Amino acid sequence: MKKRSLMKKYAAVMMAAVMAAATVTGCGSAGGTETTTAAETTTAAETTTAEETTTAAETAPETTAAETVPVTTAAPAEALREEVEGIVDEGFEMAAEAYLAAPQMLPAAKQYAGVSASAAADTWNGMIFPGGEPAAPQWNTEEYDYIKENGWRAVSASPFATFAADVDTASYANIRRMILRGQAVPADAVRIEEMINYFSYDYPEPAEGEPFSVTTEIAPCPWNEDTELLLVGLQAKKPDMEKLPASNLVFLIDVSGSMDEWNKLPLVQRAFLLLAENLDENDRVSVVTYAAGDTVVLEGVRGSEKAKITAAVEDLMAGGGTNGSAGIKTAYELAEKFFIPGGNNRVIMATDGDLNIGVTDQGSLTRLIEEKAKSGVYLSVLGFGEGNISDARMEALADHGNGNYSYIDDIAEARRVLTEEAGGTLFTVAKDVKLQVEFNPERVKGYRLIGYENRVMAAEDFADDTKDGGELGAGHRVTALFEIAQPGSKQEIGEPERKYGKGSGNETRTDGAGGQKNTQDPTAEWCTVSIRYKDPAEKSSGRDDASGQESILLEYPVDNTAVKPEMSDDLSWAAGVAQVGMILKNSEYKGSTELSGVTERLAKTAHASDDSYRRAFLYLTDRMARAE
């Protein structure tokens, strides 16, 4: 009943948006020389099927803001109402996708009202309802941590760039939602590394026995003629879905009052049922909900018991306060109770992050998660909704819980995270992954790490196995970009004056070898990429205290063979995504970046037309450019 009421609420909003266009243009009568009926008009929702895995933006109209269509008489209100309700009856999945992708409503709004695409967009984004009055603004209490962009570092003073791997993609999906809805994007909501890592790249598969491959490339920077870009790319081994270990999953679902929105709990339910479809008799599933208190809805049932899992998830209803800490404790207790040695033991938390009962401060929650992570149970955090999401809290929980953080803005994104990339989301192939790039002052005078601001580590923490890194899932990729300046570059670095010799500062190796790196030809190598990780298969049969496990060190010198006269398609795409991120942040480092130029360049790269996620990104950049 709750789902039906939310679906009807959605239908009313959808109806109001379509009718608003007719009201604004005064085309509200049923008369006229040309009649467009509801049956003759195809809305975006009708062309979105459950089998499609593309995001809503990919099927956005190809019309421009300047295009108009002949004025036609609007369909009668009752006919529109019947059509919209019919669309909803065809499936909540279709409704969710259509609503979240407001631009997809433009063709229908144009045909119903005979207005231009730009006018229809203004009507939708402003939510002007019949009568010409805009809808009352909703409170927005979304929380994002302050991000201070990484600046230029002088190699003479700081030759080491050290940071933890990050495979989260929440930031991109979240800002996509804002752009599609015509909302302003907060600068602190933009984490450029998560935007870059959302996309796949043509990195080679790792060699036999290796958890990941490493790709490096140096090419001219597209926004600064005085610098180059260094790409460091990791590609984890793609999973053989037929040989994956058994899973012990605990669905930890927020059913508090704040989840009582159609794009929160109902979307959570759809998402978890998608995941459950791929489980079998070797897997275990538990369901824990939390509101004012916590409830065990399902305990350790086999993945093959589809009917039982479906009934448990579909019967959930939202209401009450949010005692997330109680739910977290119970979820980990169940995960430990049904622990599968050598298997995938994971809590999957679905929430908007709005916690107001029990342990609520971020510091205490982080310590709680850190303690629970020692059990060998991993954590995936799925963020839902808008208006009150606590992005900072959800990211912190995932980072300290040996996990990953994704934002689910529609059912297509749920399908991408939980089915298409289930291996990466659910199965860890390398844990506590840390990267350290040591730059050669003979080749590089300064560098700037793009993104990863909240993953930067002290140089000495690289070799300290008690310091947490990031987790790399099966098939996941990590891409890091550095803007670098050669000694002869005009780029200002801000190198400090030094009174004493070169032996001070952090100019010592941190891999335990001691002393400076010995190289026969110091001009040949630009830098050395060092990576540390831990094998998740070790000590997986019991409590897994990361501080007691020794990491594995890999080193990859970067010499002139990595230098290219022009960017490869992979580097060009990653650089373009970074440029868009810098525009959204109004970065002081964006240089000559212009959206039109970025879009034009990216459209020429490989996979720009055959990769649905890249097509969607190009649509976003075009939409941003037209809104300027």
Predicted regions and their residues:
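Long, acidic serine/threonine- and proline-rich intrinsically disordered regions
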Residues: G86, E93-Y99, P103-A120, N125, ...
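Exposed acidic/Ser/Thr-rich ligand/metal-binding surfaces
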Residues: G28, V214-D432, Q491-K517, A608, ...
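C-terminal motif of bacterial Sec signal peptides marking the signal peptidase cleavage site
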Residues: A22-G26
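Acidic/polar low-complexity segments with low predicted structural confidence
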Residues: Y144-E228
